């Protein structure tokens, strides 16, 4: 009986020590996820701001196509969007099960493809229209209502990203 009492006492002491440690670990994990959600939301909102600006330019170019202006715009796309898409990619890689659906490598690759075509001077009005349709897809999401608290539960964002990636794949298949 005495050995069982000692064993029970040790077990209780272990629980007393481990429970606060476990609780703190869970709190740290929640805080880390909350911070990543906030960084991810800010990256998407920065991306939205840039896309809104570029969408207006591309829309004007689709109406009044100017190959020189479109070429200049396309030459700047990868550099302009690299940092924003890298942040999203890093967070998605950190916790793929939670953030993998938000990764945008296809969008960045599409921008690089447009830059490559601009360097070769082979851009067409169809490229401008494809870019505009991607930007329109992006704007179909109501970014004004996005917050860190609701971001990961918002199916509209994931669906919009899936649609964009599918559209990019279709455009790339047209190229080859």
Predicted regions span which residues?
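Hydrophobic membrane-insertion alpha-helices, especially the h-region
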Residues: 6-22
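Alpha-helical segments in soluble extracytoplasmic regions
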Residues: 53-118, 130-166
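Amphipathic, heptad-repeat alpha-helices with coiled-coil/zipper character that mediate oligomerization
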Residues: 42-50, 97-103, 124
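Ser/Thr-centered flexible coil motifs
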Residues: 121-128
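Cytosolic-side transmembrane helix boundary signature
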Residues: 1-5
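Extended, compositionally biased alpha-helical segments that mediate assembly or anchoring
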Residues: 167-176
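Immediate post-signal-peptide N-terminus of mature secreted/exported proteins
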Residues: 24-74
